[in-house]
């Protein structure tokens, strides 16, 4: 996944804590074992510091996963790592909720907080 696709814009309210929530209910990737498509909802919640993620660039970044063979846990952690590196937010949480496969669903959540050991 090319994190270079992600763009930012300046946060006009860097002295205020506020939460941004971004939801993509149409995320797709590919199971690395079966080669079958995986469908999920990606939710990003963060408190920005100096910059915010630009949504069109995030959309194109997500498309990079469409044909990638990658496990749910790797999707979730990769998105978190790339966004933390880019945004340097105060806090950031990524939750991926995957559609049922064989009657089983999975939700993966990973969080970052500025100042925590990485």
UniProtKB/Swiss-Prot annotation:
EC number of the protein: 1.7.1.13
Keywords recorded for this protein, A-Z: Cytoplasm, NADP, Oxidoreductase, Queuosine biosynthesis
Disulfide cross-links: none
Molecular function terms, GO-annotated: preQ1 synthase activity
Binding site for substrate: 53-55, 72-73
GO biological process, alphabetically ordered: queuosine biosynthetic process; tRNA modification
Class of the enzyme per the UniProt entry, highest EC level: oxidoreductase
Pathway assignment: tRNA modification; tRNA-queuosine biosynthesis
Pfam families to which the protein is assigned, alphabetical: QueF
Active site residues per record: 31 (thioimide intermediate), 38 (proton donor)
Localization: Cytoplasm
GO CC, one annotated term: cytoplasm
SUPFAM superfamilies per the UniProt record, alphabetical: Tetrahydrobiopterin biosynthesis enzymes-like
Catalytic activity, as annotated: 7-aminomethyl-7-carbaguanine + 2 NADP(+) = 7-cyano-7-deazaguanine + 2 NADPH + 3 H(+)
Gene3D superfamilies associated with the record: 3.30.1130.10
InterPro entries reported in the protein's UniProt record: GTP-CH-I_C/QueF, NADPH_dep_7-cyano-7-deazaG_red, QueF, QueF_type1
Job description of the protein: Catalyzes the NADPH-dependent reduction of 7-cyano-7-deazaguanine (preQ0) to 7-aminomethyl-7-deazaguanine (preQ1).
Family: Belongs to the GTP cyclohydrolase I family. QueF type 1 subfamily.
Protein name: NADPH-dependent 7-cyano-7-deazaguanine reductase
């Amino acid at each position: 996944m090319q994190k270079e696709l992600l763009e930012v814009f300046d946060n006009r309210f860097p002295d205020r804590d506020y939460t941004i929530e971004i939801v993509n209910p149409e995320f797709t990737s590919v199971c690395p074992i079966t080669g079958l498509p995986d469908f999920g909802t990606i939710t990003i919640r963060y408190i920005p510091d100096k910059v915010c993620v630009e949504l069109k660039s995030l959309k194109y970044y997500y498309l990079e996963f469409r044909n990638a063979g990658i496990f749910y846990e790797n999707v979730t952690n990769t998105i978190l790592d790339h966004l933390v590196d880019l945004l340097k937010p105060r806090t950031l949480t990524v939750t991926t909720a995957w559609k049922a496969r064989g009657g089983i669903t999975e939700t993966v959540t990973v969080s970052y907080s500025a100042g925590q050991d990485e």
